[in-house]
Amino acid sequence: MHSTASSTPHESRATSPLFNWLAVITLVYLILVAVGAVSHGFKGFSGGAEGAAQIFAFANNPFVALLLGILATALVQSSSTVTSVIVGLVAGGLPMGMAIPMVMGANLGTTITNTIVSLGHIRDRGEFRRAFAAATVHDFFNLLAVFIFLPLELMFGLLQKSAEGIAGLLLGSADLSMKGMDFMKPLISPSLDLIDGAVAFLPGKGASIATIVIGILLILFCVTALGKVLQRVMVGRAKELLHKALGRGPLTGIASGTLVTVMVQSSSTTTSLMIPLAGGGVFNTRQLYPFTLGANIGTTITALLAATAISGAGAQLALTIALVHVLFNLFAVVLIYGVPFLRELPIRAAETLARVGSENKLLALGYVGGLFFALPALMMVAVK
C-alpha cells in the first residue's frame, strides 16, 4: 500500500497536461539546438560558404552542377548559404546555365536534415517507417521536380527567362528585406555557444566533428522522447486543432508550411519538427505532404525578400537567382501536385523506401549517405 501511494504523486506529475506540454516545448527546443549543432558542425568541417564555393569550382556541365549543389548543401546544411554563394559566383562570371542546376541541387540537398531527424525513430520499426516516409517524400518530390524542370530549362530556358522578366519589373521597387529577422538564431545561439565551449579543446576539425556527433545524438534522444510525449498530448482538442491547421486540406497545409517557414526562415527546421508527429502517428505522410510543399515555397520567399534589398551591379543577378528558386518550387507544386498521377509518385516512392528501410536499417542509412554525399562526391572526383 505504502509503495503504491508513494508513487502516485510522481505518476500524476508525469501524466499531467502541464508537465507534458512543458516537456514538448523543451524537447522541441532541444531538437532545434540539435539541428543547429549539426548544421554548425558541418559548416565548420566543410569551410562554410568558402568551402561551398570551392566545391562549385568542379562544375563543368549542368548535371555535375546539380550534384555539386546537393553536396554543397548537405555539407554546409544551409540552402540559403549555398544560394548566396551561387549569387556571388554568378556576379563573378559563372554562367546562369550552371547556376540554375546548382540552385536545383541546393533545393534537394536541404532535405537531408529532416531525413537525419527521422533516424531518431530507427529503434522502433513502426515509428521509423512512418517517420522515414514523411521525411523522404520531400526528397522524392524535389527529385521529381528536377527530372521534369531541368530538361525544360536546358532546352527552353523556362526558369531563367521567366525570372529575368520578373526581376526587371521588381528592380527598383521598395525594399522588402528580411535581413536580420532571423527569429531562431537568438533562441538557440546560447546553447550552441555552450556546445562550442565544451568541444573547443579539440584540435583541427575535431571540434566540428564533435559538434556534429553531439547534435546527432541529441536528435536521436529528443526525437524518441518527443514521440512518446506527443502520444500523450495529441489527444482530444489539441489533436483536433492541429489537424485543422495542417490537415484540413491541401491548400491549408501548403499555406501553413509556407507561413511557418517564412517565420523561422528555415525549411529544414519546419519539416524536421513535423517528423516526430509522423513517427508518433499523429499525421501520416499524405497529410504532411502539402505542408512540406509549403515549406519548399516558404524558404524561397525569404530569399526573394532579402534579394529585393540588394542594390548595385549585383541586384539583377541576385533577384534573378532568387526568382529562379521561387519559380522552380511554385511551378513544381502546381504541376506535380496539380496532376493526380504525378502527385502520387513521391508518396508511393517514399512509402516503398520506408517499408524496405524499416526492414533493413543499413539500406536506409545507405540511402542517406549515397544520395546526399557519395554520389555527388564521386561525380566531383570523376570530373577532377
Feature roles, as predicted:
Residues 21, 29-33, 116-186, 217-224, ...:
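Juxtamembrane and boundary regions of transmembrane helices in multi-pass small-molecule transporters
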